[in-house]
Amino acid sequence: MNAIAVSPVQHVGVIGGGQLAWMLAPAAQQLGMSLHVQTPNDHDPAVAIADQTVLAAVADAAATAKLAQACDVITFENEFVDLPALTELEETGVRFRPRPAAIASLLDKLDQRQLLTRLGLPTPRFLAIAAATATESELTALGFPVVLKQRRHGYDGKGTQVLRSLAELQQALQSYGDTPLLLEEFIPFEQELAVMVARSQSGAIATFPVVQTHQQNQVCRWVVAPAAIPGALQKAVAAIARTLVETVDYVGVAGIELFQQGDRLWVNEIAPRTHNSGHYSLDACQTSQFEQQLRAIADLPLGSTALQWPGALMVNLLGFEDHQSGYAELRQQLAALPGACLYWYGKTESKPGRKLGHITLPLSGASSTERAQQAQTMLAQVEAIWPNPDTAHQP
C-alpha cells in the first residue's frame, strides 16, 4: 500500500458485486473511500463490505441512477451493462469512470477485433457470423481448429469453444439461436500472457508486470509473475496496452490477454475492469490492481507496480463439486503453506469450475527457470489440498 493521499472522491459506486468489487474494500478503506454496490443478490461477495447496496441487475439503469445519488463516481466490476442507458445517465451528470464512450468498443468482441485492426495491433483473423444464416464457405474460411465465441456476455469459459472440424462447428451452432457470434483463427501459442494497465483521468499510465496465465476449460487456473519472456516482448506488450487505453481515453484499470508464439504476439481479449490475471498484485506488487483502480478513477497519483518479491504464483480455487460448503478445513491447510496469502470470496454455493477464492505464493528463485520449477512444486502442493476440477473425480 502506498502513502495515503486525501482523495477528492469520497464515495465510489461499483456496478457489480462479485469478488472483483469485494477486493476493492481494503484499498478503499485506506484511501478513505466508501463503496456503494449495485448487484442482484444479497449474498454476492461485495455486499458484505459495501457501505450501501442497491439490489438490482447490473444492467438496470434506474437502479444505477439511484446508486449515483450517493456516489461521486461510478466504476464497473463487469461489462454486462446497458451502455445506451448509461450514456443517457451520463448526460444528466452522472460520472462514470471509465466513461461509457471509452468502453463502447470493448464490450463486444467483434468491436474489440475491429478496434485492434484499425490500430494495426496484432489480432487473430476473425469473422462475424450468425448461426442461422452462416454459409459453409464462411464457416471454413479460417480453417480448423477454429474458435467460436459469443460476442457479448461470455466469461470464464462460457461462450467460448475450440472446434476442430466443420461438423463440430455446425453442431455447436445449433445451441446459439440468434446470439451474435464471432469466429476466430486458432493460434497455436507457446504460452498465454496477460498485463494489467492503469490510466488516470489526467492521462498518467502505469503497466503491471507481464504474467503467464494457464487456462483450463477456458477458465484461468493459475498465473505466474513475471512471465519468462525477453525484454523486447515485455516492452511490446506494454506498448500495446498503452496504445489501447490512450486511444479510447480509458480511465481505470484494464486487463489485456495475449498469445505468444516465438517473438510474435496476438491480442486475445480486453477486459475493461480489474481482472483475474492481476490478483497476484494484492500481495506481490507495491500497488495492487484494486488500489490502482481507485487511484485512477479518483485521479490520485498512480502507485508503483513493481514486484515486492522475485516472483509469485497465483492459483484459482475452482469449485470441484456441486456443494454448499465453506471448506474450512481445506482453507486452513492452504493457509498453512509457506508464505501463503489466501482469499476466500464467501460464495454460498460451489459448482465445478466456479471461482471460490485464490491463493498467492511467493517465488524466491533468482532466475525464471528456478521460479518456474518452484511454481510447479507449489502448484502440486496446492492441488494436493484443493483438487483440480478436472481430476477431482478420477479413480
From Swiss-Prot:
Q: Which reaction does it catalyse?
A: 5-amino-1-(5-phospho-beta-D-ribosyl)imidazole + hydrogencarbonate + ATP = 5-carboxyamino-1-(5-phospho-D-ribosyl)imidazole + ADP + phosphate + 2 H(+)
A Gene Ontology molecular function term of the record: 5-(carboxyamino)imidazole ribonucleotide synthase activity
Which domain of life does this protein belong to? Bacteria
Which segments constitute the ATP-grasp domain? 113-298
- Pathway membership of this protein? Purine metabolism; IMP biosynthesis via de novo pathway; 5-amino-1-(5-phospho-D-ribosyl)imidazole-4-carboxylate from 5-amino-1-(5-phospho-D-ribosyl)imidazole (N5-CAIR route): step 1/2
Give the EC number(s) listed in the UniProt record.
6.3.4.18
One GO CC annotation, please? cytosol
Q: Where does the chain bind ATP?
A: K109, K149, E184, E185, F186, I187, E192, N268, E269
Keyword line: ATP-binding, Ligase, Nucleotide-binding, Purine biosynthesis
Q: Does the keyword Nucleotide-binding apply?
A: yes
Q: Keyword Transcription on this protein?
A: no
Which is a Pfam family this sequence falls into?
PurK_C
Enzyme class name? ligase
- Please state the span of the N-terminal signal peptide per the UniProt entry: none
Per the record, the GO terms for biological process are: 'de novo' IMP biosynthetic process
Check the record and name the NCBIfam families matching this protein. PRK06019.1-5 (NF004679), purK (TIGR01161)
- Family the UniProt entry places it in: Belongs to the PurK/PurT family.
Q: What does this protein do?
A: Catalyzes the ATP-dependent conversion of 5-aminoimidazole ribonucleotide (AIR) and HCO(3)(-) to N5-carboxyaminoimidazole ribonucleotide (N5-CAIR).
Q: Give the quaternary structure.
A: Homodimer.
Entry protein name? N5-carboxyaminoimidazole ribonucleotide synthase
Origin species: Synechococcus elongatus (strain ATCC 33912 / PCC 7942 / FACHB-805)
Q: Which gene encodes it?
A: purK
